[in-house]
Amino acid sequence: MINLGDKQSIIVVAMSGGVDSAAVAAMLHAQGYNVIGITLQLYDHGMAVGKKNACCAGQDIYDAKMVANKLGIPHYVLDYESKFKESVIENFVDSYLQGETPLPCVQCNKSVKFKDLIKTAKELGAAQLATGHYVRKINGDNGAELHIGIDPAKDQSYFLFTTTKEQLDYLSFPLGWFTKDETRKLASKFGLEVANKPDSQDICFVPDGNYKNVINKIRPGSSKKGKIIHVNGFELGEHSGIINYTIGQRRGLGIAYNEPLYVIKIDPNNNIVYVGPESALNMQEFIIKDVNWLADEIKDNEKLEVAVKIRSTRLPSLAEISKLGDDKMKVKFLSEEKAVAPGQACVIYDGERVLGGGWITRDIIITL
């Protein structure tokens, strides 16, 4: 039983068309809450119709509507294409052009799904906005805290580190206490056709998985050839455009050499891709920017031992963090890590609690 307060309250559910948000809507409706479903149309409908297994595609909008009809709850589709293009797609493209490896799902949660959905939910008089994310909101001594979901295979806390304290107070994550199998069983119990619908896998606005086509469409002429240089300083060949490379990449370099080579650094200003041996990927310190902090404030000279994740699929690593001004932090691993990629998120944990996070910069990752 999920307790969201007064049963007469309006609860807006962000319905993506998948099984998770459908199960949330059905569960809250069954418990007597006044549920309203909202689905965002985020990109070109023609593209969406042809795209399967992606969040907020045309089929997903239809599926969300069918779930709402079955439950007998109001459902609205809001057109956020222009906002999504500006805040997410163009940010994604420009990040690649800066030699970064972007994380568009985090930008979408930050700039569109939470920010704008919360605004809409409040305009509808809702007491809370509920989503199908696998994270937990726990009331601590100093207010709401963001914790990992109990199902480690589905935990989505890495993608929600930009959630502010004010947003967290208004949000609800009922599925943080469920495993994926339990969610599907719940959806089946309510007779929802999406109970066995596959999870979304791809970036929603990349219809064929080829992000380079999207970049070249938004920013024509982006694939400019340039030099591939070894970290020791000698030229090895020519690259096909920095958008085709990411830190740690080994395959597709097109270079014959006497040892395996990896992408070590991308220099967008000079259009250079630096490569080197795997050992050159090792590093211990880096800087994160645009830090969002959900815990007690860190003092200027304080060093805090934490666990950090630098990729959604990696296990947390022990590190020490310290402040660098208002919105930056220095992160120092206790042991060296490989392939820390600018543009990715560094999310900071204390056990199961999310303390905050920021965006990895190229500062002091490597000095050539």
From Swiss-Prot:
InterPro entries: MnmA-like, MnmA-like_C, MnmA-like_central, MnmA-like_central_sf, Rossmann-like_a/b/a_fold. Keywords: ATP-binding, Cytoplasm, Disulfide bond, Nucleotide-binding, RNA-binding, Transferase, tRNA processing, tRNA-binding. Its EC number is 2.8.1.13. Its main location: cytoplasm. One of its GO terms (biological process) is tRNA wobble position uridine thiolation. It is found in: Cytoplasm. The record marks H133, Q344 as: Interaction with tRNA. ATP binds at A14, M15, S16, G17, G18, V19, D20, S21, L40, G132. It holds the Pfam family tRNA_Me_trans_M. Disulfide bonds join C108-C204. Coiled coil: none annotated. It comes from the Bacteria. One of its GO terms (cellular component) is cytoplasm. It catalyses: S-sulfanyl-L-cysteinyl-[protein] + uridine(34) in tRNA + AH2 + ATP = 2-thiouridine(34) in tRNA + L-cysteinyl-[protein] + A + AMP + diphosphate + H(+). The active site is at C108, C204. CDD domains: MnmA_TRMU-like. Residues 154-156 are annotated as: Interaction with tRNA. One of its GO terms (molecular function) is tRNA-uridine 2-sulfurtransferase activity. Catalyzes the 2-thiolation of uridine at the wobble position (U34) of tRNA, leading to the formation of s(2)U34. Belongs to the MnmA/TRMU family. This is tRNA-specific 2-thiouridylase MnmA. The gene is mnmA.
